[in-house]
Amino acid sequence: MKIAVYPGSFDPITNGHLDVIQRAAQVFDQVVVAVAHSSTKEPLFSIEERLDMLRVVLQKLPNVRVDAYRGLTVRYAREQGARALIRGLRAVSDFEYEFTMALTNKKLAPEIETVFLMTEAKYSFISSGSVKEVARYGGCLEDMVPVPVERILRDKFGMRGEG
């Protein structure tokens, strides 16, 4: 069985993330969407809230499961029996950082490959940070996040209707 781990903070999940997950699910037998506990970022949503959001959004993908982890991503991937890490790329500017991380991960776990998937062009401008900024100021989130996540963001920021 070909297992891949797609790690990230998913704070919140965006349509760009969803695009990468859906395409990874077509390539791998099982995809583990792994929410990282971060000691360096202050998240908007708790781990539990992010896991719940992901479960709602991904429920129709039978070969995708959601989990949380701490520590080194490659260690977690090994524990899951994964042979690949999925990394989404929005633009060339993402590549330098991701390439450096891929080399580091390869040094730590030579048996685990990093697979880069480009998001569709229509999602290339979306990041969790930009989504939070738009939501914070009551802007339109249409096409940026899945509908259930839009509702959660509107509740979180006390927004009403369309931005």
From Swiss-Prot:
Protein name: Phosphopantetheine adenylyltransferase
Localization of this protein: Cytoplasm
A Pfam family of this chain: CTP_transf_like
GO molecular function: ATP binding; pantetheine-phosphate adenylyltransferase activity
Catalytic activity: (R)-4'-phosphopantetheine + ATP + H(+) = 3'-dephospho-CoA + diphosphate
Xref: PANTHER family: PHOSPHOPANTETHEINE ADENYLYLTRANSFERASE
Binding site for substrate: S9, K41, T73, R87
Keyword NAD (UniProt): no
GO biological process, one term: coenzyme A biosynthetic process
Subunit note: Homohexamer.
Top EC class, one word: transferase
Annotated site (Transition state stabilizer): H17
Pathway of action: Cofactor biosynthesis; coenzyme A biosynthesis; CoA from (R)-pantothenate: step 4/5
EC number: 2.7.7.3
Signal peptide bounds: none
UniProt keyword list: ATP-binding, Coenzyme A biosynthesis, Cytoplasm, Magnesium, Nucleotide-binding, Nucleotidyltransferase, Transferase
Residues holding ATP: S9, F10, H17, G88, L89, R90, E98, Y123, S124, F125, I126, S127, S128, G129
Cofactor(s) listed: Mg(2+)
InterPro entries: Cyt_trans-like, PPAT, Rossmann-like_a/b/a_fold
Role: Reversibly transfers an adenylyl group from ATP to 4'-phosphopantetheine, yielding dephospho-CoA (dPCoA) and pyrophosphate.
Natural source organism: Desulforudis audaxviator (strain MP104C)
Family named by the database record: Belongs to the bacterial CoaD family.
